[in-house]
Amino acid sequence: MRGNNVNLKTVSGSAVELSEVAFGREFNEALVHQVVTAYLAGGRQGTRAQKSRAEVSGGGKKPFRQKGTGRARAGSIRSPIWVGGGKTFAARPQDWSQKVNRKMYRGAMQCILAELVRQDRLVLVEEFAVAAPKTKELLAKLNDLNAARALIVTDAVDENLYLAARNLPHVDVVDATAIDPVSLIAFDKVVMSVAAAKKIEVELG
């Protein structure tokens, strides 16, 4: 299977051959779901914490006698049903990360890239750059590609491109080595230079 290629075309019409392993794999929904879920879970901070009745300061003395007051009996002013009391099921810091091995991660990335190709959401260009860090210039280029909400993948960091895209809420620029499954599926289109595609092919092929 490693010898097979997928034939794609750039916007200008040039033919590009890419590895079928990286850009032509059959979609595995369960695998992609597991990897994306694990990726999102790994981004959770997990530092929330609350105090139980045992941890809230005070409340050691019985607030009033057991009988004769007409009130419901109480043993502590830090009971969860009292204002200022502890939390019944106090939250604890938690590590939400999930283990995903390298083979699964690579497989999910291959599935996502192949699905982008099948859905015509992957836009290949010879190169993608702007002469100056101007948002207006970048927006015009994206509109020409019908890609207003796009992830731009380049083979190297382009300072002008990064600065031009910084003010656009639905546009992001990443290096080919920094793509992740969530970013690939979050945008309507993925605008990718041929050089970036070749770099990804080496990484995933």
UniProtKB/Swiss-Prot annotation:
Keywords: Ribonucleoprotein, Ribosomal protein, RNA-binding, rRNA-binding. Pfam families: Ribosomal_L4 (PF00573). Disulfide bonds: none annotated. GO terms for cellular component: ribonucleoprotein complex; ribosome. Residues 47-70 are annotated as: Disordered. One of its GO terms (biological process) is translation. InterPro entries: Ribosomal_uL4 (IPR002136), Ribosomal_uL4-like (IPR013005), Ribosomal_uL4_dom_sf (IPR023574). It comes from the Bacteria. One of its GO terms (molecular function) is rRNA binding. Part of the 50S ribosomal subunit. Belongs to the universal ribosomal protein uL4 family. HAMAP family: Ribosomal_uL4_B. One of the primary rRNA binding proteins, this protein initially binds near the 5'-end of the 23S rRNA. It is important during the early stages of 50S assembly. It makes multiple contacts with different domains of the 23S rRNA in the assembled 50S subunit and ribosome. Forms part of the polypeptide exit tunnel. This is Large ribosomal subunit protein uL4.
